[in-house]
Structures are given as C-alpha cells and as structure tokens.
Amino acid sequence: MWLKSYTRGMTEILRSSTFSAWLLKLADSRARMRIQVRIDRMADGQFGDVKAIGEGLSEIRIDYGPGYRVYFMQQGRQLVILLCGGDKSSQTRDIKQARLIAKSWQEQNP
C-alpha cells in the first residue's frame, strides 16, 4: 500500500497507492507536472501554499485547473507521506479518505 517515491536531501517522500493511482489517472499532463513540481519542492523543504486540516493532516493547494489538492502528513522533518489527491469539487470526500489512509499508516507504523 505504501510506495517509496524518493529521498531528496534529508526528506523521504512516501506515496500511498491511492495517491499514485490518482496521479496516474489525471488526464491533464500539465496538472501532473505541476503537482510533481510541488512535491519536489516539498522534498526540498519548500511547502508553499499549505493548509492544516486537522488530526495532523495538511493539504497542498495547487492553483491550477479545478484547484488540485494533495493531502499529506509529516512525521518529523525527514518523512512526508502523500495520502491522496483530488480537487476543490471532491474536497470533503478526499479529506475523509485521507484521514482513513492516515489512520491505516499510523496503525501499521506505531
């Protein structure tokens, strides 16, 4: 369920299979590129437009197209876990899904 994306500097990025499937499914290649650039910047410690959504989770807001969102959690300074993604129209549903995925991660990695 968890795919190691890469380590850059001292930050390791993990992707859930849910996040990876969502990103691959995006038809807009420019959107995929913009999202990947934001993830690369996170790995460099530059999080940009991020909003805490509670329970230790945050969303990256990407001002492109329908308003893409990437939901993530962070453990310490070295590990960022990408949970799921969506856009403004599916935000409520995506946040619920992100919370379930985060709970699963925390149970598997106490």
Enumerate the language-model features and the residues they cover.
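Short, surface-exposed beta-strand/loop micro-motifs that present aromatic residues
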Residues: R69-M73
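Basic, Lys/Arg-enriched alpha-helical interface segments
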Residues: M1-P66, G76-V80, D87-P110
